[in-house]
Structure formats: structure tokens, C-alpha cells
Amino acid sequence: MSNKTILAGLIFCSFASFAQQKSSAGLVQYVKPIIGTQRMGHTYPGATVPFGMVQLSPETDTISYEQNGKYNPDVYKYCAGYQYDDHTITGFSHTHFSGTGHSDLGDFLVMPTVGTLKLNPGTATQPKSGYRSNFSHANEVSAADYYKVKLDDYNITAEMTASTRVGFHQYTFPKSDQSHIILDLMAGIYNYEDKNVWTYLHVVNDTLVTGYRQTNGWAKNRTLYFAMKFSKPFIAYGNRNYSKKEVYRGFWGKFNQSKNFPEIAARKLRAYFDFKTEEGEKIKIKFALSPVSMDGALQNMQTETPGWDFDAVKEAGQKTWEQELSKITIQTKSLAEKQNFYTAMYHAMINPTIYMDADDKYKGLDQNVHVAKGFTNYTTFSLWDTYRALHPLFNIIEPKRNDDMIKSMLAHFDQSPEHMLPVWSNSGNENWCMSGYHSVAVIADAVMKGNASFSTQKALEACVATARKRNYEGIGEYMDKGFIADEHNGV
């Protein structure tokens, strides 16, 4: 009998009895999020909790989706924003896909710097022309819900952790009268010239900033709100507007729009916040997200991270990961096998992602605010990828979550202008990526396994209605003729 056969048998036994087993101590030590970050793995090394709404992770370059008006194939390497072979970091953004073959997100990039203020990211070949920094993997740590790296050009140590809806930054600065924290509202993954529809920034006081970013990308109509709180008051702040000159500019010219503004709005903004720091001084940032409102983001922050204890948030996140990973235990003397297995399990528990505020509110496909009554609302359903194995696995080790995911899919059906179950949904949008009809397999599998607290009659009606949608993927022609005369699939 081969080692693989023995391992498979052990895993099968663990599936059958995980509820009775005690947690194996220290399974998080085997998680290596850096796995998959090279070439086309499309994973990210940053901090997130299981199925978290925040994925706080570094970006290593600014590769545009377009080049000379055409698709730039180099962008495909940056689906998750990070490439292991790169030598610079442009900053740390709060939203990422994991393992996808297309991309979006990369919202609200934060970058600490020291010295002369630079608001352009620069290039990989000339990093000192902008705010990016060189880094070395020798000074990088990537673990479950924790990321750490030294920004060599600034002698700043950057640390990240996260709760479900809040990214927690901790930056250790050198002594300087010119310390800055940049908030780049223009940066994004799969970026292009007109992707930003609008951005807004409200400086509430010298420690709190709120705002939003609206984009037109893979999700065509997406608005994400934020609240950003500093542990130390900034002494000055400002921004630079990179938008094209507007025909209509209003009467904002009576105010200073580059410094000491209470609010500013434009398509393309980069803001900065200035500090004086002592050697080894830590500046912390809590960065909360909301699909609903700026107030929702602030409430999420107050609910999940009321204090400033970075280590406590990190420990809570790693405890949550430990609980999830302990649902399957394996027995092997091979460290590599443990790392591969538990990192794969970790990656399996990143998506779908929670998509609602702490008060259960979320924005639906109809652009109205809804309340998830009795379930947790999820998004990021790459169903053509996940119906075969991931959701069947969830029925075994995450039955409550999978049940909630199907309730989220049924809510999607109710709110969809097309009255269809999701094809590939993210950020409260249907992006229509890939062909097929995979929602029904996820629903049917849950029903057959007895994991269906939702209305099976409603689910059946949603499945039938979606299957009979005449204007989707040639279904009308198939219903009329029994075949499709020509394929015109818009994958």
C-alpha cells in the first residue's frame, strides 16, 4: 500500500469523526500562505480570517490591465496582487481574490514612508522614483492571519492582521520628522484608466477618516465604504487629484482642495497623512470595510476591534483558524505533507467571503440595502470552480456555512434583475464569468445530504426558473430546436 493510499485513508477516517476529535494543538504552524504566490498560483500572503470580508495583503507592482489600448497579458500574473519573484512592495490593500483566473479588487492601498513625500508609486526598475520600497523574503513572515515585512528603503517594519471586517496595521517607524502614511484610492488590481468611477474622503478629525470607492471592473457596479482610524493624531494631511480636467468643476475652488480639507471627492485621489516619529515608535491603523455605508464601516470597527491590542486581534484570528483546521487531522511524519495539507485547507476556507455588516445589513444585487435574517450573507461564488469539490467538502466540515451560502444564493435569486441564481457573483454583483449552470449542483448536493434548512420548494423553483431563462447561453434556442445552432458564449 502506498503512502498516498494510507494518507487518503487517514483523511477519510478524520472526515467521519472530526466532530468527536479534540483540536490538535498548533495546526496553524503548518499554514504557509506564501505557497501559491509564484507564477500563476494567484494566491496572496497577507492576513485574513476564515471567509473574512477583509484580505489585507501586500501588492508588489502596478501592472495595468491595458497597454496602448489593448489587453496587457502581464496583468494575469497579478490576479492576487503579489508575485513572489518581485522585489518591491507598493503598499497593502484590503481586498483580494485567492486562486482565481481573473481579477478585480485591491481596494484602499496603504503605504508608510519616510523622507521626502512621493505620491507616485514609481516603477519596479526605478523604485526610488516613487513611494514603493524594496524588500527581501529574508525579512518577511507569512502566517495564518499575520503578515510581516521590512520595507528596506524606509527602515519600517510593517505588520498586518485582521478580523472579519477590519484590517489591523502596525508600522514600526525610525526617528523622523518626515514620516507619512499614504492612502492611495487610485490603486487597484486589474486596473485601467477609467476603472475608478468615483472616490470620496471625509477627514472627521485628526485620527479618523472615512470614505468610499466606486469602481467599474469585474463587478460592474461596486461601491465599498471604509473607516480608517489612527492610533496617533496626524500633524498634517493633504491629497493630490490625478483626475482628468472636468468640463464642469463647480465652485469648490473657493476652498483649498489639496490641504486641510474636511472632505474631497474625485475620480482619482491619493491622500497622505504626516507624522513625527521616534525610533521604534509604532503607529497602528484600524481599517474597517462595509458594503453599505461609512457609518456601517465605523460600526464594524467598534464591534470587532474596539481597542488597540494588535496581538490580541492576531491571536483571536489564529485561534479561529485553529478551530477550522482542526476539523480534519492527518497523521504523517512529513513536515512538508503537513504544510501542504493545512495550507490547502487554509486556502479552501478563504472563499466564499462574508458580505454583510456586523448588524447583518448588506447591499443586494438590486442595489437596495437588505438584512440577512437568520443567516450570514456570502459573496465570491466562483461556482464553476467550486461545485465539484469545495461545496461538497463544506457539507461535511462546514454544514452551517454551506447552508448559509445557499441561502445567500437564494437571496441573490430574489434580488437579481434577471431572477437567476448566481453564475459567478462577487461584491453583490453578478459578473457572468464562465458558462454553465452550477448553482443547482450545490443546492441538490446539500438537499441530498440532508443539509438544507432553507425552503427546498423555493430552491426548486429558483433552479427551474434559472434553467428556463431563454436569453442565457442559448437556452431559448435549445428549448425551441433541441440544439444550439452556433455558440456565442461570452465567457
What annotation goes with each model-predicted range?
Residues 1-22:
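Bacterial Sec-dependent N-terminal signal peptides
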Residues 21-441, 445-491:
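Accessory carbohydrate-recognition regions in carbohydrate-active enzymes
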